[in-house]
Protein backbone atom coordinates (compact mmCIF):
# COMPACT_ATOMS: atom_id res chain seq x y z
CA UNK A 1 0.00 0.00 0.00
CA UNK A 2 1.27 3.49 -0.82
CA UNK A 3 0.72 5.74 2.23
CA UNK A 4 1.31 9.50 2.49
CA UNK A 5 2.19 10.93 5.91
CA UNK A 6 1.81 14.59 6.87
CA UNK A 7 3.07 15.53 10.32
CA UNK A 8 5.96 13.08 10.31
CA UNK A 9 7.78 14.95 13.09
CA UNK A 10 4.95 14.45 15.58
CA UNK A 11 5.48 11.78 18.24
CA UNK A 12 3.18 9.28 16.54
CA UNK A 13 4.39 10.21 13.06
CA UNK A 14 8.02 9.54 13.96
CA UNK A 15 7.19 6.04 15.18
CA UNK A 16 4.56 5.22 12.56
CA UNK A 17 7.03 5.39 9.67
CA UNK A 18 9.23 2.42 10.70
CA UNK A 19 6.14 0.37 11.57
CA UNK A 20 4.60 0.93 8.14
CA UNK A 21 7.91 0.07 6.49
CA UNK A 22 8.11 -3.09 8.57
CA UNK A 23 4.63 -4.04 7.33
CA UNK A 24 5.78 -3.67 3.73
CA UNK A 25 4.05 -0.38 2.88
CA UNK A 26 5.51 2.24 0.55
CA UNK A 27 5.75 5.37 2.71
CA UNK A 28 5.75 8.91 1.33
CA UNK A 29 6.73 11.66 3.79
CA UNK A 30 5.66 15.25 3.20
CA UNK A 31 8.15 17.51 5.00
CA UNK A 32 8.98 21.20 5.04
CA UNK A 33 12.76 20.66 4.94
CA UNK A 34 13.88 17.61 2.97
CA UNK A 35 17.57 18.03 3.82
CA UNK A 36 16.88 18.24 7.56
CA UNK A 37 14.60 15.20 7.44
CA UNK A 38 17.10 13.09 5.51
CA UNK A 39 19.96 14.07 7.82
CA UNK A 40 18.07 13.38 11.04
CA UNK A 41 16.17 10.16 10.33
CA UNK A 42 17.91 6.87 9.69
CA UNK A 43 14.90 5.49 7.81
CA UNK A 44 14.91 8.36 5.27
CA UNK A 45 16.62 6.12 2.70
CA UNK A 46 13.65 3.74 2.79
CA UNK A 47 10.88 6.29 2.16
CA UNK A 48 9.96 8.75 -0.57
CA UNK A 49 10.58 12.28 0.69
CA UNK A 50 8.57 15.16 -0.77
CA UNK A 51 9.02 18.80 0.16
CA UNK A 52 6.23 21.18 0.96
CA UNK A 53 4.83 23.52 3.58
CA UNK A 54 1.10 22.91 3.99
CA UNK A 55 0.67 26.59 4.79
CA UNK A 56 2.04 27.49 1.34
CA UNK A 57 0.19 25.53 -1.35
CA UNK A 58 2.64 26.37 -4.14
CA UNK A 59 5.60 24.98 -2.18
CA UNK A 60 4.26 21.42 -2.17
CA UNK A 61 5.97 18.97 -4.52
CA UNK A 62 3.62 17.08 -6.89
CA UNK A 63 2.25 13.95 -5.23
CA UNK A 64 2.26 10.54 -6.92
CA UNK A 65 -1.16 9.89 -8.41
CA UNK A 66 -1.37 6.33 -7.10
CA UNK A 67 -1.43 7.09 -3.37
CA UNK A 68 -3.79 4.67 -1.61
CA UNK A 69 -4.18 6.25 1.83
CA UNK A 70 -2.90 9.13 3.94
CA UNK A 71 -2.35 9.97 7.60
CA UNK A 72 -2.79 13.58 8.68
CA UNK A 73 -0.88 13.92 11.96
CA UNK A 74 -0.44 17.70 12.15
CA UNK A 75 -0.91 18.97 15.72
CA UNK A 76 -3.85 21.39 16.02
CA UNK A 77 -4.02 22.01 19.75
CA UNK A 78 -2.73 25.55 20.30
CA UNK A 79 -5.80 27.53 21.32
CA UNK A 80 -5.51 30.91 19.58
CA UNK A 81 -7.67 32.35 16.81
CA UNK A 82 -4.59 32.93 14.67
CA UNK A 83 -3.50 29.32 14.99
CA UNK A 84 -7.04 28.12 14.24
CA UNK A 85 -6.89 29.90 10.89
CA UNK A 86 -3.48 28.37 10.14
CA UNK A 87 -4.71 24.90 11.14
CA UNK A 88 -7.66 25.27 8.76
CA UNK A 89 -5.40 26.47 5.93
CA UNK A 90 -3.07 23.51 6.44
CA UNK A 91 -5.96 21.04 6.30
CA UNK A 92 -7.47 22.74 3.24
CA UNK A 93 -4.19 22.60 1.33
CA UNK A 94 -3.73 18.98 2.34
CA UNK A 95 -7.16 18.03 1.03
CA UNK A 96 -6.57 19.98 -2.17
CA UNK A 97 -3.36 18.13 -3.03
CA UNK A 98 -4.60 14.73 -1.85
CA UNK A 99 -7.76 15.23 -3.92
CA UNK A 100 -5.62 15.17 -7.06
CA UNK A 101 -4.55 11.58 -6.33
CA UNK A 102 -6.29 8.22 -6.12
CA UNK A 103 -6.26 8.37 -2.29
CA UNK A 104 -9.31 6.58 -0.87
CA UNK A 105 -8.74 6.99 2.85
CA UNK A 106 -7.44 9.58 5.34
CA UNK A 107 -6.73 8.83 9.01
CA UNK A 108 -6.23 11.47 11.69
CA UNK A 109 -5.97 11.54 15.49
CA UNK A 110 -8.38 13.42 17.72
CA UNK A 111 -9.14 13.87 21.40
CA UNK A 112 -11.46 11.66 23.43
CA UNK A 113 -12.47 14.57 25.62
CA UNK A 114 -14.80 17.04 23.92
CA UNK A 115 -14.05 19.58 26.64
CA UNK A 116 -10.33 19.37 25.88
CA UNK A 117 -10.91 19.57 22.13
CA UNK A 118 -11.38 23.03 20.69
CA UNK A 119 -12.78 24.68 17.62
CA UNK A 120 -9.53 24.59 15.64
CA UNK A 121 -9.28 20.82 15.92
CA UNK A 122 -12.97 20.20 15.23
CA UNK A 123 -12.80 22.53 12.22
CA UNK A 124 -9.87 20.54 10.86
CA UNK A 125 -11.93 17.36 11.13
CA UNK A 126 -14.74 19.01 9.16
CA UNK A 127 -12.28 19.99 6.43
CA UNK A 128 -10.72 16.53 6.28
CA UNK A 129 -14.13 14.88 5.83
CA UNK A 130 -15.15 17.27 3.06
CA UNK A 131 -13.05 15.63 0.33
CA UNK A 132 -13.54 12.45 -1.66
CA UNK A 133 -11.40 10.14 0.54
CA UNK A 134 -13.16 8.43 3.45
CA UNK A 135 -12.09 9.77 6.85
CA UNK A 136 -11.31 7.86 10.04
CA UNK A 137 -10.76 9.74 13.31
CA UNK A 138 -9.06 7.90 16.16
CA UNK A 139 -9.68 9.74 19.43
CA UNK A 140 -7.15 9.16 22.20
CA UNK A 141 -6.49 10.38 25.73
CA UNK A 142 -2.99 10.05 27.18
CA UNK A 143 -0.48 8.23 24.94
CA UNK A 144 2.18 6.24 26.81
CA UNK A 145 5.53 5.44 25.24
CA UNK A 146 9.21 6.21 25.65
CA UNK A 147 9.62 9.88 24.78
CA UNK A 148 5.88 10.63 24.78
CA UNK A 149 4.64 13.88 26.31
CA UNK A 150 3.02 12.00 29.20
CA UNK A 151 6.14 10.10 30.23
CA UNK A 152 8.35 13.15 29.79
CA UNK A 153 6.04 14.93 32.22
CA UNK A 154 6.13 12.03 34.69
CA UNK A 155 9.92 12.06 34.51
CA UNK A 156 9.99 15.77 35.37
CA UNK A 157 7.55 15.32 38.26
CA UNK A 158 9.39 12.43 39.92
CA UNK A 159 12.84 13.93 39.42
CA UNK A 160 12.21 16.27 42.35
CA UNK A 161 11.29 15.48 45.95
CA UNK A 162 8.62 16.16 46.97
CA UNK A 163 6.52 15.81 43.83
CA UNK A 164 4.46 18.93 43.12
CA UNK A 165 1.12 18.43 41.33
CA UNK A 166 -1.84 20.79 40.70
CA UNK A 167 -5.00 19.88 42.62
CA UNK A 168 -7.07 19.77 39.43
CA UNK A 169 -5.02 16.84 38.10
CA UNK A 170 -5.08 14.48 41.09
CA UNK A 171 -8.56 12.98 40.69
CA UNK A 172 -8.80 13.23 36.90
CA UNK A 173 -9.70 9.83 35.46
CA UNK A 174 -7.89 8.77 32.31
CA UNK A 175 -7.80 5.80 29.97
CA UNK A 176 -4.17 5.82 28.79
CA UNK A 177 -3.14 3.90 25.71
CA UNK A 178 0.26 2.50 24.78
CA UNK A 179 1.89 4.23 21.81
CA UNK A 180 2.41 0.87 20.13
CA UNK A 181 -1.34 0.19 20.33
CA UNK A 182 -2.08 3.55 18.68
CA UNK A 183 0.28 2.60 15.85
CA UNK A 184 -1.40 -0.80 15.50
CA UNK A 185 -4.85 0.77 15.27
CA UNK A 186 -3.69 3.21 12.59
CA UNK A 187 -2.06 0.49 10.48
CA UNK A 188 -5.03 -1.86 10.86
CA UNK A 189 -7.51 0.85 9.86
CA UNK A 190 -5.74 1.75 6.61
CA UNK A 191 -8.15 1.01 3.74
CA UNK A 192 -10.31 -1.02 6.13
CA UNK A 193 -13.79 -0.19 4.84
CA UNK A 194 -15.31 -0.96 8.24
CA UNK A 195 -13.47 2.12 9.50
CA UNK A 196 -14.49 4.45 6.67
CA UNK A 197 -16.23 7.70 7.68
CA UNK A 198 -16.23 6.82 11.37
CA UNK A 199 -14.87 8.13 14.65
CA UNK A 200 -13.50 5.75 17.25
CA UNK A 201 -12.39 6.22 20.84
CA UNK A 202 -9.24 4.18 21.46
CA UNK A 203 -7.81 3.49 24.91
CA UNK A 204 -5.99 0.88 26.94
CA UNK A 205 -7.59 -1.61 29.35
CA UNK A 206 -7.11 0.59 32.46
CA UNK A 207 -9.13 3.51 33.81
CA UNK A 208 -6.97 5.27 36.41
CA UNK A 209 -6.79 8.58 38.21
CA UNK A 210 -3.75 10.71 37.49
CA UNK A 211 -2.55 10.05 41.04
CA UNK A 212 -2.83 6.27 40.53
CA UNK A 213 -0.87 6.53 37.29
CA UNK A 214 1.82 8.60 38.96
CA UNK A 215 2.20 6.09 41.81
CA UNK A 216 2.46 3.20 39.33
CA UNK A 217 5.08 5.10 37.36
CA UNK A 218 7.03 5.90 40.53
CA UNK A 219 7.02 2.20 41.43
CA UNK A 220 8.80 1.37 38.16
CA UNK A 221 11.46 4.07 38.69
CA UNK A 222 12.12 4.65 42.39
CA UNK A 223 12.81 2.37 45.35
CA UNK A 224 11.62 5.00 47.83
CA UNK A 225 8.18 6.57 47.46
CA UNK A 226 8.54 10.38 47.47
CA UNK A 227 6.07 12.75 49.09
CA UNK A 228 3.45 14.61 47.06
CA UNK A 229 2.65 18.31 47.46
CA UNK A 230 -0.61 19.53 45.90
CA UNK A 231 -0.71 23.00 44.37
CA UNK A 232 -4.06 24.82 44.39
CA UNK A 233 -3.68 26.00 40.79
CA UNK A 234 -1.36 25.95 37.76
CA UNK A 235 -2.27 27.46 34.38
CA UNK A 236 -2.26 25.48 31.15
CA UNK A 237 0.04 28.03 29.52
CA UNK A 238 2.64 27.83 32.28
CA UNK A 239 2.48 24.03 32.51
CA UNK A 240 2.81 23.67 28.73
CA UNK A 241 5.72 26.10 28.59
CA UNK A 242 7.55 24.25 31.37
CA UNK A 243 7.10 20.89 29.66
CA UNK A 244 8.15 22.34 26.31
CA UNK A 245 11.22 24.02 27.83
CA UNK A 246 12.43 21.10 29.96
CA UNK A 247 11.80 18.26 27.49
CA UNK A 248 11.85 17.62 23.71
CA UNK A 249 8.02 17.72 23.70
CA UNK A 250 6.53 20.39 21.41
CA UNK A 251 4.33 23.11 22.90
CA UNK A 252 1.30 21.82 20.96
CA UNK A 253 1.71 18.27 22.29
CA UNK A 254 2.34 19.61 25.80
CA UNK A 255 -0.79 21.74 25.68
CA UNK A 256 -2.89 18.82 24.47
CA UNK A 257 -1.67 16.72 27.40
CA UNK A 258 -2.26 19.45 29.99
CA UNK A 259 -5.77 20.15 28.67
CA UNK A 260 -6.62 16.46 29.03
CA UNK A 261 -5.56 16.54 32.68
CA UNK A 262 -8.30 19.07 33.47
CA UNK A 263 -11.13 16.68 32.59
CA UNK A 264 -11.87 12.96 32.72
CA UNK A 265 -10.81 11.35 29.43
CA UNK A 266 -12.40 7.93 29.10
CA UNK A 267 -13.57 6.04 26.03
CA UNK A 268 -17.26 6.70 25.41
CA UNK A 269 -17.55 3.67 23.15
CA UNK A 270 -15.40 0.70 22.21
CA UNK A 271 -16.60 -0.19 18.72
CA UNK A 272 -13.00 -0.23 17.45
CA UNK A 273 -12.63 -3.53 19.31
CA UNK A 274 -15.24 -5.09 17.01
CA UNK A 275 -13.00 -4.30 14.05
CA UNK A 276 -9.49 -4.65 15.46
CA UNK A 277 -9.05 -6.96 18.43
CA UNK A 278 -5.32 -6.49 19.01
CA UNK A 279 -4.12 -7.13 22.59
CA UNK A 280 -3.57 -3.91 24.54
CA UNK A 281 -0.85 -3.08 27.05
CA UNK A 282 -1.85 -1.96 30.53
CA UNK A 283 -0.48 1.33 31.83
CA UNK A 284 1.96 -0.56 34.06
CA UNK A 285 3.18 -2.63 31.12
CA UNK A 286 3.54 0.49 28.97
CA UNK A 287 5.47 2.37 31.65
CA UNK A 288 7.72 -0.61 32.35
CA UNK A 289 8.42 -1.13 28.65
CA UNK A 290 9.32 2.53 28.23
CA UNK A 291 11.60 2.42 31.28
CA UNK A 292 13.37 -0.76 30.18
CA UNK A 293 14.04 0.56 26.68
CA UNK A 294 14.92 4.13 27.73
CA UNK A 295 18.22 5.06 26.16
CA UNK A 296 18.26 2.05 23.85
CA UNK A 297 15.23 2.61 21.68
CA UNK A 298 15.36 4.75 18.58
CA UNK A 299 12.86 5.62 15.89
CA UNK A 300 13.31 2.27 14.18
CA UNK A 301 13.19 -0.24 17.01
CA UNK A 302 10.06 0.50 19.04
CA UNK A 303 9.14 -3.06 20.09
CA UNK A 304 5.90 -4.33 18.65
CA UNK A 305 3.27 -6.09 20.73
CA UNK A 306 2.84 -9.56 19.29
CA UNK A 307 -0.58 -11.12 18.95
CA UNK A 308 -1.04 -14.57 20.41
Go through each PLM region and give its residues:
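Mid/C-terminal beta-alpha module of Rossmann-like enzyme folds, strongest
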Residues: 2, 188-253, 264-308
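Residues at the starts of beta-strands that form the adenosine-phosphate
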Residues: 2, 26-27, 46, 104-105, ...
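N-terminal Rossmann NAD(P)H-binding glycine-rich loop of SDR-like oxidoreductase domains
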Residues: 3-25, 29
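Mobile, glycine- and charge-enriched loop segments
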Residues: 4, 11, 59-78
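Conserved Rossmann-fold cofactor-binding substructure of NAD(P)-dependent oxidoreductases
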Residues: 44-68
